[in-house]
């Protein structure tokens, strides 16, 4: 995702082939995502992450370290040194996927749609050859999860 370029935006969607599998992914750009793209526009890539960090591993390492520091701190000792008490010591970038799937399940979004939204294959390899999953279901699921996070939708609908 960090290597996306402007040409990966096609008709209001981010389209790219995953390196690991070669599979084409197409994700609708919701207004909230467009706001992030606009705010963090990069020089060479869609986002400025690689303008700021030397490589993907450096970026992930720094982000995960920062996520682990979320939480209150207090000053201790004569020098007033900050002592952190992380709220979520195991928090990492992987939690975004886990959280999306959990929230989607709370909204009674079908497991098949959640699986597709995570980029997992549907059913057996043979079956998935004959089934073209309706991407609109994933688009709708993404919108519902975003609305739920912002308090615009209630669980159990």
List the predicted regions and their residue ranges:
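C-terminal secondary-structure termini that scaffold catalytic or DNA-interacting sites
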Residues: 44, 50-54, 81, 137-157
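Short, polar N-cap/turn motifs at the start of nucleic acid-interacting alpha helices
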Residues: 7-13, 90, 109-131, 152-157
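Short, contiguous acidic/charged loop-to-helix segments that flank catalytic cores in large enzymes
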Residues: 15-24, 49-59, 87-95, 132-136
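Extended non-membrane alpha-helical scaffolds
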Residues: 67, 87-89, 128, 140-143, ...
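C-terminal catalytic core of Y-nucleophile DNA break-rejoin enzymes
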Residues: 19-69
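Hydrophobic alpha-helix feature that most strongly marks membrane-spanning transmembrane helices
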Residues: 3-6, 14, 38-42, 71-75, ...
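Catalytic-site neighborhood detector that most strongly recognizes the C-terminal catalytic loop/helix
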Residues: 18-22, 118-144
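Short, basic (Lys/Arg/His-rich) helix/loop patches that form interaction surfaces
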Residues: 65-116, 120
